[in-house]
Amino acid sequence: LDGQVAYVTPVVHNGQIIQITGKYVFGTDIKTGKIRWTYDFASAFEEKERREISCVTPLVDGQFIIATRGYNHGTVLLELAADGNSVKPLWKNNDLDTQHGGTVLLNGHIYGSTWINNSSGEWACVDAQTGRTIFMQPWQVPGKDGKLIPLGKGITIAADGMLYQFDDKRGTLALARPGQDNLDIVSSFNITYGTKEYWACPMISDGVMYVRRGDVLAAYDVKAK
């Protein structure tokens, strides 16, 4: 395949490795290494300035594959054929264009951040069945003086029906409750340790959330009480 490499973790599904490059979403047979299918993701949307940089692992749910990336590129839902040899696009959404980390599928909705520029974005919710944008909202948290501080874009993960959002520029980590037309920020705090960017995706295992920044790794108890 031609095109730029990507910063994406592959997904293993039904005997295939599903992956994204700068140009394609594609599936590779685990046993033979043969490429079973490709989808021209780079040409799926029209951008004024095309940047074939993919940093978001695809979401796979049964025969459905959700692919997104930043830079005004948007999100597409693909349906994998029963024989595993082809895909077809079911819908495209121009609002949800997550740049870093990931999006999540929760109760039939896709949650993630949008890309306005490399320092800012909003948080969005998209209907997974129709591709309709349900809401988009700025992310704001209370400052020390009680005034709301606008934050940017970043990473979204989920556990126990709640969303954890990690701002990739300022290091703010927030717990959010998804609602019908917005996200309700329950609590938040800032990651102050480590160095450089906040690009590592937090992970949750057995009620413990692991957060890395640079050469420092921290663990937090996030079990539902």
Q: Where would I find each of the regions flagged by the language model?
A:
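Noncatalytic, solvent-exposed loop/strand surfaces
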Residues: 1-225
